[in-house]
């Protein structure tokens, strides 16, 4: 199941640095985390869906790169982000 527009707006509002911010690493990581969690649930019932699994691996790699960038810019914001999203790193 895809992420809904309402849920995406909630994530943007929660993690935005300033009004109208949709491109900061925090917002991008939050949206990717939501999509990754949805795909993880999808794989519990569709174990052989290898096409979507490749997309999942791409999303995880993108999220990891964004997290590395966020960490290089501000350790405090990075720590707050992974704590709020429940990501283990």
Curated annotation (Swiss-Prot):
Database matches in SMART domains:
Ribosomal_S15 (SM01387)
Q: What is this protein called?
A: Small ribosomal subunit protein uS15
Family membership noted in the UniProt record = Belongs to the universal ribosomal protein uS15 family.
| One GO process term, biological-process aspect | translation
Q: How does it assemble?
A: Part of the 30S ribosomal subunit. Forms a bridge to the 50S subunit in the 70S ribosome, contacting the 23S rRNA.
NCBIfam families, per database record:
S15_bact
Pfam families linked to this entry: Ribosomal_S15
Q: Which GO terms describe its molecular function?
A: rRNA binding; structural constituent of ribosome
């Amino acid at each position: 199941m895809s992420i809904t527009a309402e849920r995406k707006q909630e994530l943007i509002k929660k993690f935005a640095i300033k009004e109208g911010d949709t491109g900061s690493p925090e917002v991008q990581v939050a949206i990717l985390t939501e999509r990754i969690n949805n795909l993880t649930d999808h794989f519990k019932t569709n174990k052989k869906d290898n096409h979507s699994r490749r997309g999942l691996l791409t999303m995880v790699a993108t999220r990891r790169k964004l997290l590395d960038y966020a960490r290089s810019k501000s350790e405090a914001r990075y720590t707050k982000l992974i704590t709020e999203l429940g990501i283990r790193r």
